[in-house]
Regions:
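Mid-to-C-terminal alpha-helical segments outside catalytic/metal-binding sites
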Residues: 1-7, 33-41, 62-66, 74, ...
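Histidine/acidic-residue-rich catalytic or RNA/ligand-binding cores of hydrolases
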Residues: 116-123, 163-178, 212-218, 231-245
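Short, conserved clusters of charged catalytic residues that mark active-site
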Residues: 90, 94, 140-143, 208-211, ...
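Histidine- and/or cysteine-centered catalytic micro-motif in compact active-site loops
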Residues: 111-112, 162-164, 205-207
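Active-site gating/metal-coordination segments in enzymes
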Residues: 6-142, 146-147
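Active-site gating loops and adjacent loop-to-helix segments of metal-dependent hydrolytic enzymes
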Residues: 114-136, 173-199
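Aromatic-lined glycan-binding groove of carbohydrate-active enzymes
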Residues: 144-147, 153-195
């Protein structure tokens, strides 16, 4: 209320998959049930994202379905890595396929990278300072090159922090295929930038640099930017103040704050 935010979409945070399969599954179901009670009490203020441990694909598919059908959840908050696998892994495909069938977007949330070179200098390097952006960028790039968006052409994916590394590298990704024809084992049927026009949206969460926003706007278009907050890791007020400080016109402000979410994801605001 203090920040003027009318509706938030909630999920539990990192860590649900760090235990054995049975414990992780019980924790996920219990957390989903508890969060659903909050949403049911204030449905005009909150919506929910499911968080799924990926030890067992069959469980993940069933729990995502339960979250949608019984609890009214909006999407799947998937991590950028699940320890030994990422979202391009064949074990994850049935869950992505079910998300499409349920018309649930997939938010790729950063997880601590399992990349040795990112470790050794503390949290600032391995988490939000660098590692999170790198890990999400790797995962989404692998999904593109694996042809997942070609197999699931209506899959909708959201990433945060003004698009992680993509605003700066997307053209070079295109050129590596279009000009240099470095295809290797890549199975994507379109240039990477085309999936950002049809399947991928970004949020403004936790990146308060005006030139970075302008870059993301130029690369992706204002229609592909959603308001996000990273709350409680970041300040709600600071997120709102940042967007309002950019000098956007009323139409663009509306698009970022609510219209894109309503138009492309049918979020009820």
């Amino acid at each position: 209320d203090e920040a003027g935010v009318d509706k938030c979409f909630l999920s539990i945070s990192l860590g649900i998959g760090q235990f054995d399969a049975q414990t992780s599954q019980k924790l996920a179901m219990a957390n989903h049930d508890e969060l659903a009670q909050v949403i049911a009490k204030y449905p005009h203020r909150f919506g929910g994202y499911a968080v799924l441990p990926m030890h067992d694909t069959e469980f993940a598919v069933k729990e995502l379905t339960r979250c949608h059908d019984e609890l009214g959840y909006f999407g799947w908050n998937a991590f950028s890595n699940f320890g030994d696998k990422r979202l391009d892994d064949k074990a994850c495909f049935p869950v992505l396929e079910r998300a499409v069938q349920l018309n649930m977007p997939v938010y790729i949330h950063p997880s601590v990278p399992q990349i040795p070179d990112l470790h050794g200098y503390g949290p600032a390097m391995v988490t939000s300072g660098l590692g999170f952006a790198v890990d999400v960028t790797i995962t989404l790039t692998r999904m593109i090159f694996a042809g997942i968006f070609d197999r699931l052409p209506t899959l909708k994916v959201i990433i945060g922090h003004l698009g992680e590394c993509f605003p700066m590298i997307l053209r070079r990704m295109d050129d590596s295929l279009r000009v240099q024809k470095i295809t290797g084992k890549a199975r994507n049927q379109k240039l990477p930038s085309e999936y950002f026009k049809e399947n991928i949206w970004i949020t403004s969460s936790g990146n308060f640099l005006a030139p970075a926003f302008q870059c993301a706007k130029d690369v992706f278009g204002i229609e592909h930017i959603l308001f996000g907050t990273d709350y409680p890791m970041e300040s709600l007020n600071e997120n709102v103040d940042f967007i309002e400080s950019l000098g956007l016109g009323e139409e663009d402000l509306d698009r970022v704050f609510w219209k894109n979410a309503e138009e492309y994801f049918h979020m009820k605001m």
